[in-house]
C-alpha cells in the first residue's frame, strides 16, 4: 500500500507520495489498484468546483498519471465525479451492498486489462427504505467533522476482498 498517511493495518506500506513510486527507475508494475483522493473530483463537492479549480486540476493530473502508467493491469476507484467527463465513463459502478455491506456508496471503477468485478454477496434493499449509512431522505448520515472525508473514503472490506480474490 502507499499513502501519505500511516497505515491502519500491518503489512508492507510506503508512506509518501505515489509519484515517487510511479517514476522510480526500477519500477516494473504487474498490477496497480489505485484509490486516488476524491476530495476535488467527486460530484458531492460540485458546489465548490469554481473555488477549487487549481486543486481540482492537480487531482485530475494525478488520476491521469495513474491511468497512463506503463502497467498491463490497472484499476482506479473513485466515487461518481468529474472524471466521467474529463476522461471517460467508468467501466463499472459498484455498490457496497453488492459485496455484503448494508450501505450505499456508488463507486466507479476504471479498468485496464482487468475483468469487471463480480458481486459476491448481494443484499436486499432494506424494508425501512434506506441503507445503514443513510438518513430516511437518502443523505449520508455522517455529520461534518475533521474525520468525515476519511470515514467516507474507507474501502469496504467485501469490495477489497473481491478485488484480491478476483484480480490477485
Task: Show the residue positions of the predicted features.
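Conserved active-site and SAM-binding loop architecture
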Residues: 1-168
Amino acid at each position: 500500500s502507499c499513502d501519505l498517511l500511516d497505515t491502519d493495518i500491518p503489512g508492507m506500506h510506503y508512506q509518501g507520495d505515489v509519484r515517487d513510486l510511479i517514476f522510480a527507475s526500477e519500477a516494473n508494475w504487474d498490477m496497480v489498484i489505485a484509490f486516488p483522493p476524491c476530495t476535488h473530483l467527486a460530484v458531492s463537492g460540485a458546489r465548490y468546483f469554481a473555488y477549487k479549480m487549481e486543486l481540482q486540476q492537480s487531482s485530475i493530473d494525478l488520476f491521469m498519471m495513474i491511468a497512463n502508467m506503463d502497467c498491463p493491469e490497472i484499476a482506479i476507484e473513485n466515487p461518481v465525479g468529474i472524471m466521467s467527463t474529463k476522461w471517460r465513463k467508468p467501466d463499472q459502478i459498484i455498490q457496497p451492498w453488492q459485496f455484503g455491506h448494508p450501505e450505499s456508496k456508488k463507486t466507479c471503477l476504471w479498468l485496464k486489462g482487468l475483468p469487471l468485478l463480480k458481486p459476491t454477496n448481494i443484499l436486499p434493499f432494506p424494508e425501512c427504505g434506506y441503507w445503514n449509512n443513510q438518513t430516511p431522505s437518502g443523505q449520508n448520515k455522517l455529520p461534518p467533522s475533521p474525520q468525515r472525508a476519511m470515514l467516507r473514503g474507507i474501502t469496504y472490506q467485501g469490495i477489497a476482498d473481491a478485488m484480491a480474490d478476483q484480480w490477485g
